[in-house]
Amino acid sequence: MNSLVLHRIGVALTCTFFISVTTLAAEPAALRGYNAAIGDSSVSGISSGAFMAIQFATAWSSVVKGVGVVAGGPFWCAQADAIDVFTNYQAPLWHATGSCMVGPPLDLNIFVAKAAEKAASGDIDPLKNIGRQKVYIFHGFNDAVVAKSVTDAAAEFYRHYLGEANRGNLYYQTAIGAGHSLVVLQE
């Protein structure tokens, strides 16, 4: 037998083993409820988690009351849907690790148009809900990972939907000399 045949047999046996083990796994225990009011939910994150917090808060704006963003960018910053990863895998990766992290300044119109398209098709909640959210955005001025222009775009995205009447719902902090980090109070 040559090494290619042995390799294929090894792969087949390994796959068979893992398939048989996963079919024997016990059912996971059900999570218990906490009687939390779904409409009082908030979401927050730092860095990639901040990007995801904005995705979630925009998509599920009817249930998200507050958003905390530390070094994150606007909705749909990577400019890709799940299917795009399979059809053009390099473009989403470039946006996510390129323009969504280090700039150049982002075009707000792209993100607003995509949000409107998604809301019109029913893929995400109506965008008017964003206007009632309380939003905290932080960017340390020594952050060398996510450019301030990217976090500025997140703030502009929210300003667009908050409008003049709800401008007070956004607090954007950029005056602290922090790096790419979550700042805590030291006592």
PLM features: what roles do these ranges have?
Residues M1-V11:
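Bacterial N-terminal signal peptides that target proteins for export
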Residues G10-S20:
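Bacterial N-terminal signal peptides
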Residues V21-A25:
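Sec/Tat signal peptide C-region and signal peptidase I cleavage site
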Residues E27-I38:
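Conserved acidic catalytic loop of the alpha/beta-hydrolase fold
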Residues A37-S42, S62-G66, G131-Y136, N166-Y171:
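Loop/turn elements at helix/coil->beta-strand transitions in domains of secreted/extracellular proteins
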Residues G72-K128:
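Mobile cap/lid helix-loop segments that gate and shape the active-site cleft of serine hydrolases
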Residues Y136-F138, N142-A144, D152-E187:
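C-terminal catalytic histidine-bearing segment of alpha/beta-hydrolase fold enzymes
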